[in-house]
């Protein structure tokens, strides 16, 4: 009786409904400020390359480090471009690290990205250390996002970036102009304190909750402050040059990455379909083999034994078919791995020309920025000693 139930349960089904997800292709509108923001109150934004999230993956995830590294930069740059279109901010830059002092910081982690679904954990805080947002964003896209016939070059996951931008703007609009100006002042004082702690340490203090507050302000004609502002202008020059690098990188990888993501989407959907079909076929095959063996053992007639043999043979065919479909799914995933490797050439080190020097990015961008910071510190001390 139990065997009969098993054979009944594992009989292959022909219907495959419910495998593909239904998604919306409607573009989410990007919000703009409710009222114009004065230039002096426009906050600068720094977006660090996202954490690749590789430490959160397991052996079953089809994740390739070289792709995730590229995505970490690409996604940050995509968010920057979306936020720029809102007209609600000052300079929006992808920065090498959160060591770059700015008014608003955006960081995050890639939790999932396979061409079909993207999940990001995003954190936003300001120069005071006050957290604005800590939220998980998720979007699942459909096959039409990759339909070449639609000639749609928009990012398939643009809605996710728009939602992040809208949420950040929503928090920004809760701030008064005075509070925004205070944030900009704190950013300047933090930068000044970094280069001359003995001169600027007393101007800002840390409250019990860990956020910063202004104790008092230096004179506008303070010579040390004026030198620090010149140093900060040079820092902006470097960061803007780095933004050109990030923009160029994103443009270079865009078409190749969209092809990769389209293939990844198709592979993920196909692999899921094959995996589900394969599981049913494998279990059905095992059940049919057991039924055939059980029937041969219990049958006392030739006809019964022949029927049982046929049942077992059918079960063997179904089992083989199921395993072949699983192997086919693995082949699709392997194809994604090959495409991921092809992106390595587009994240090679580049040479950046500055006004009076050339910076070669042979290591990490963060490492290069640390060298730049050390150079600025040296320039500041030389200029201060010359006065």
Please provide the spans of the model-predicted regions.
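Amphipathic beta-strand/beta-sheet edge segments enriched in Tyr/Trp
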Residues: 107-148
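Short, glycine/alanine-rich hydrophobic alpha-helices that insert into or span membranes
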Residues: 281-293, 311-317
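Acidic helix-start/capping segments at beta-turn-to-alpha-helix junctions
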Residues: 93-109, 183-190
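Bacterial N-terminal signal peptides
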Residues: 1-9
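N-terminal segment of the mature soluble domain
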Residues: 41-100, 130, 163, 167, ...
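C-terminal/domain-edge helix-coil "capping" segments
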Residues: 15-40, 140-279, 297-303, 316-387
């Amino acid at each position: 009786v139990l065997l009969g139930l098993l054979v009944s349960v594992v009989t292959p089904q022909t219907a495959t409904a419910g495998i593909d997800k239904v998604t919306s292709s409607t573009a989410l509108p990007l919000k703009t400020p409710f009222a114009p923001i004065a230039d002096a109150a426009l906050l600068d934004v720094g977006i660090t390359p996202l954490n690749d999230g590789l430490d959160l993956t397991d052996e079953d995830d089809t994740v390739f480090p070289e792709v995730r590294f590229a995505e970490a930069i690409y996604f940050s740059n995509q968010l920057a471009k979306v936020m720029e279109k809102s007209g609600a901010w000052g300079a929006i830059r992808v920065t090498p690290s959160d060591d770059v002092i700015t008014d608003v910081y955006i960081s995050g982690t890639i939790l999932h990205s396979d061409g079909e679904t993207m999940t990001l954990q995003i954190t936003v805080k300001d120069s005071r250390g006050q957290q604005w947002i800590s939220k998980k964003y998720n979007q699942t896209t459909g096959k039409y996002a990759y339909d070449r016939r639609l000639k749609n070059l928009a990012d398939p996951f643009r809605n996710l970036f728009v939602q992040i931008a809208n949420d950040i703007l929503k928090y920004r609009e809760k701030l008064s102009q005075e509070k925004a100006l205070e944030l900009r002042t704190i950013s300047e004082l933090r930068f000044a304190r970094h280069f001359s702690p003995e001169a600027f340490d007393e101007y800002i203090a840390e409250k019990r909750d860990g956020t910063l507050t202004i104790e008092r302000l230096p004179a506008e004609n303070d010579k040390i402050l004026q030198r620090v502002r010149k140093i900060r202008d040079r820092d902006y020059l470097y960061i803007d040059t780095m933004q050109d690098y990030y923009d160029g990188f994103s443009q270079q990888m865009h078409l190749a990455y969209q092809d990769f993501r389209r293939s990844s989407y198709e592979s993920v959907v196909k692999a899921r379909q094959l995996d589900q079909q394969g599981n049913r076929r494998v279990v059905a095959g095992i059940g049919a083999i057991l039924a055939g063996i059980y029937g041969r053992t219990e049958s006392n007639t030739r006809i019964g034994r022949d029927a049982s043999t046929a049942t077992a043979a059918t079960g063997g065919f179904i089992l083989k078919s199921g395993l072949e479909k699983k192997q086919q799914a693995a082949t699709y995933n392997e194809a994604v791995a090959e495409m991921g490797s092809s992106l390595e050439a587009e994240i090679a080190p580049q040479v950046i020309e500055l006004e009076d020097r050339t910076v070669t990015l042979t290591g990490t961008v963060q490492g290069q920025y640390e060298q730049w910071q050390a150079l600025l510190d040296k320039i500041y001390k030389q200029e201060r000693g010359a006065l």
